[in-house]
């Protein structure tokens, strides 16, 4: 929907982004024209009164949201100090209600596909244009691709790994993926305790292909589970206790190589110099992935995706208790509030990699159809998985927030006053 005064967009398309850099979402409430480049223009996000990140905001189930408000004028944001200078987003989740138990369940299946695909030049034109570029710089240069090779590639009569014509995008990516969402929430309560509880599960998948010879899946899969419990407890007349607790757990499985890098390789790797994979010959016929290359340190896009995988876990939990005491019996319109919130977030990642086997096509016998491969594999090449020390990391952050608030409202005749003090 539309929210007056707020501009937001997301330029990252990674399924199940676990960091704000991967999500790459921006919110602007008060504009950025007066800020210098690189200045912090992010608004303050308060989720049930607790400062939260854009990542936490993105993980709230829509059915859990009660209100979503935007504050941008100076008087409204004054109580938040300098942190509210860029505007404030206030989100409150649903609370319990007195009455019988009311439960709702929801399940969704979503098919996703790219909105746009970039068309690239076909392999034959690529070779012609490459030769033309060489001759433009040096008229005496020898063309890299012979007329015979260009004609044989065009004919399509020979095995695709002898005269490759790779569409790397089709080789790496599927046409679509399937995502799932399930949610359950319960609401109800008595005069003393009202409750709202929900559990939501999301399964998001990417569109990367996995080779059948691999013992592991290279595609992105993220399983996200979120729990939320909100309690309102009437201790006695004029005194309430609010308890909000939420936890989100993400379990991510994906390729060792970033999807952004894979996408970049798909449009920059040569479509004709080597095949994604070569079939076995007399010397290297045992079952394994024989990645094509022309030199030892050349990057094969298919190899970069299939060589390993990454396991990532992110959790975030927020627990808040608020004490509300209505003192209207002492001073009409006076209310005191005190709250404490504890938030913790953790991120863990472990990478597993193989040492891929690399080969180039040494020769091909057009009469017998036999071929020979040249082994360009690095020392210690193996399809056995091992932990990648460069892809192992963990971080944990804990934050405790206290707040004391006094509110006084009064009205006489046609006038109203409101006074708020916050610490």
Model-derived segments and spans:
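Flexible N-lobe loop architecture of eukaryotic-like protein kinase catalytic domains
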Residues: 72
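Small-side-chain secondary-structure face that scaffolds active or pore-lining regions
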Residues: 200-224, 254-256, 261, 312-318, ...
């Amino acid at each position: 929907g539309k929210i007056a005064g707020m501009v937001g967009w997301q330029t990252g398309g990674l399924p199940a982004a676990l960091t704000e850099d991967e999500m790459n979402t921006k919110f602007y409430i008060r504009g950025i024209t007066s800020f210098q480049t690189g200045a912090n223009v992010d608004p303050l996000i308060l989720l049930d009164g607790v400062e939260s990140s854009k990542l936490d905001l993105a993980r709230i189930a829509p059915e859990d949201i009660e209100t979503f408000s935007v504050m941008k004028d100076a008087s409204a944001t004054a109580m938040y100090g300098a942190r509210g200078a860029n505007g404030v987003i206030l989100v409150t989740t649903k609370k319990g209600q007195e009455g019988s138990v009311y439960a709702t369940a929801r399940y969704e299946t979503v098919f996703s596909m790219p909105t746009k695909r970039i068309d690239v030049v076909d392999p034959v034109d690529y070779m012609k244009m490459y030769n033309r570029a060489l001759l433009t710089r040096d008229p005496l240069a020898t063309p890299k691709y012979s007329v015979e090779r260009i004609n044989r590639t065009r004919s399509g009569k020979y095995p695709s790994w002898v005269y490759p014509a790779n569409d790397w995008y089709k080789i790496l990516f599927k046409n679509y993926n399937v995502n799932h969402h399930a949610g359950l929430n319960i609401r109800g309560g008595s005069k003393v305790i009202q409750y709202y509880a929900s559990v939501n599960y999301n399964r998001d998948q990417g569109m990367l292909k996995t080779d059948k010879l691999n013992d592991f899946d290279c595609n992105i899969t993220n399983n996200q589970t979120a729990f939320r419990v909100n309690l309102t407890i009437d201790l006695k007349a004029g005194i309430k206790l609010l308890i909000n607790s939420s936890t989100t757990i993400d379990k991510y499985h994906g390729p060792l190589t970033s999807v952004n890098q894979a996408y970049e390789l798909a449009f920059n790797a040569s479509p004709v110099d080597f095949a994604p994979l070569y079939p076995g010959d007399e010397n290297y016929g045992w079952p394994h992935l024989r990645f094509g290359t022309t030199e030892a340190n050349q990057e094969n896009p298919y190899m970069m995706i299939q060589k390993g995988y990454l396991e990532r876990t992110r959790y975030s939990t927020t627990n808040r208790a608020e004490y509300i005491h209505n003192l209207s019996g002492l001073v009409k319109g006076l209310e005191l509030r005190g709250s404490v919130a504890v938030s913790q977030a953790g991120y863990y990642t472990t990478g597993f990699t193989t040492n891929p086997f690399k080969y180039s096509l040494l020769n091909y016998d057009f009469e017998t159809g036999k071929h020979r491969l040249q082994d360009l594999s690095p020392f210690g090449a193996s399809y056995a998985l091992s932990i990648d020390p460069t892809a192992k990391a963990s971080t944990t952050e804990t934050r405790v927030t206290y707040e004391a608030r006094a509110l006084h409202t009064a009205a006489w005749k046609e006038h109203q006053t409101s006074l708020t003090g916050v610490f």
